[in-house]
């Protein structure tokens, strides 16, 4: 339950801090909202008139699966799916930045180092 509250807080803060580019965002209405909290987990969802969406499901073990999304200032639908479990928060989506590929020379150097471990050091006596 703690993870659920934390994730909703993060989503809420991110939504609150996002720059508002359209005047109708200020007057967005909640079109639908559902919260079902049970002993074995929960389900929740939210949909607003300006395109903000959120849905999450959790189980009694603290595992949560969900997604959230909004309409960008460019008019594109941004969606992030996530899993939160014993391995932490794991977001995925086309909008999540990815690191650039490792340069070929670096990859070769790492492969060489892995195939040639250093010789064991012998203690020196004085």
Curated annotation (Swiss-Prot):
**Which organism is this protein's natural source?**
Drosophila melanogaster
Task of the protein: Component of the larval cuticle.
Does the keyword section mention Signal? yes
Gene Ontology CC: chitin-based extracellular matrix
According to its UniProt entry, one GO biological process term is: chitin-based cuticle development
The chain's coiled-coil residues are none
- Keywords for this protein: Cuticle, Signal
A Pfam family matched by this chain, by name? Chitin_bind_4
The protein's name is: Larval cuticle protein 2
Q: Which InterPro entries match?
A: CHIT_BIND_RR_consensus, Cuticle_Struct_Prot, Insect_cuticle
Renumbered to this chain, the signal peptide range is: 1-16
The record, for PANTHER family, names: CUTICLE PROTEIN, CUTICULAR PROTEIN 65AU, ISOFORM A-RELATED
**Domain of life assignment:** Eukaryota
Which intervals hold domain Chitin-binding type R&R? 39-100
GO MF, one annotated term = structural constituent of chitin-based larval cuticle
């Amino acid at each position: 339950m703690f993870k659920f509250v934390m994730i909703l807080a993060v989503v809420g803060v991110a939504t609150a801090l996002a720059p508002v580019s359209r005047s109708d965002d200020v007057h967005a209405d909640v079109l639908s909202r559902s919260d079902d909290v049970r002993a074995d987990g929960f389900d929740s969802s939210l949909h607003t008139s300006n395109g903000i969406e959120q849905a999450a499901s959790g189980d009694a073990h603290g595992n949560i699966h969900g997604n959230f999304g909004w309409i960008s200032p460019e008019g594109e639908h941004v969606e992030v799916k996530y899993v939160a479990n014993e391995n932490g928060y794991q977001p995925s989506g086309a909008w999540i930045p990815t690191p650039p590929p490792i340069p070929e020379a670096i990859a070769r150097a790492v492969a060489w180092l892995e195939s040639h471990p250093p010789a064991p050091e012998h203690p020196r006596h004085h």
